[in-house]
Amino acid sequence: MKPTLFSFLLLFAIPVFAQKTDKQLQSKIEQAISGFQGEIGIYVKNLRTGKTVNIHADTIFPTASIVKVPIMTGIVYKMNKGELHYDSLFTYKDSLLYEGEDILGSFKSGEKIALKKLLMLMLTTSDNTASLWLQTIAGGGANINRILDSLGFKDTRVNSRVPGREAFRAIYQWGQTTPKEMGQLFEMIYNRKLFSSDLCDRMMRMLAKNYWDENEAISQIPPTIAVFSKNGCVNKTRNEAMIVNAPKNPYVFCIFTKNNKDISWTHENEAWTMARKVSKLLWGYFGTKP
């Protein structure tokens, strides 16, 4: 019998087990975010001890550009099956253009580009034209959602350009997730349990090259420390998901917001300021902890 998508991915599905809460850290974070004018969800996990912080971590939030991590997962799934290769070439067409300031949009119709460069544009600069093209190359959002479901993720979904998900798109736009599920996806990559070790290593290398590091929480991590991250933002949303490879206590940190009162795009934006504050707190807690 030919193995199904579900039977293959079930081998790597997220583990379900009781997690201990770091009550001291949870209290510190709750104090840090007190008074925030919007809705917030936070998931933190010490990957050495397994202790967690869950603050509305099972609430669904818009992904904004963090949807590009599930899209990457769909692409790497095909690489794992041998249907795509890191050096596979694709031909750009003007019909692929998504209006904006994307680098790929400057290409001329007929120019060729390697899959690895499309992935770099999606994950490093968050190029939307590249991302929507990669969503198609991965088999479309519905196929990505089937993969996510088989991995055990029930709330993480691609909504844009997916028949039957129009109502979800109206609420959450391109994609949706919870802080906990996104943190678990990052953890599976970090622990090399999503695909082969080589492919998970490749995913981490791609996630380690985030261009957006000035306003965001990642700015509070010393540049000598590897951080695997993706951020996303639209008017009322500021999100970040990351694993900080602290020497003795590597940790997951996911912070999602929605319905934010402050929709400014300055460094002082309330959500960005809060994310930096929590990130600094976490680095002080984990980064120097024996």
Which positions does each model-derived feature cover?
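Mid-domain, small-residue-enriched loop/turn segments at the edges of structured enzyme/sensor domains
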Residues: L119, L132-F186, Y190
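Bacterial Sec-dependent N-terminal signal peptides
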Residues: M1-K23
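Short, well-structured active-site flanking segments
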Residues: Y77-S95, G141, S196-C200
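Beta-lactamase-like hydrolase cores
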Residues: Q19-T59, L281
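Soluble periplasmic/extracytoplasmic beta-strand elements of cell-envelope proteins
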Residues: G41-K45, N54, P70, T91, ...
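Structured C-terminal helix/loop/strand segments within mature extracytoplasmic catalytic/sensor domains
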Residues: K20-A32, T136-I137, G141, Q184-N215, ...
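Active-site SXXK
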Residues: G50, P62-F90, F253
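Conserved catalytic neighborhood of penicillin-recognizing serine enzymes
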Residues: L97-W133, G141
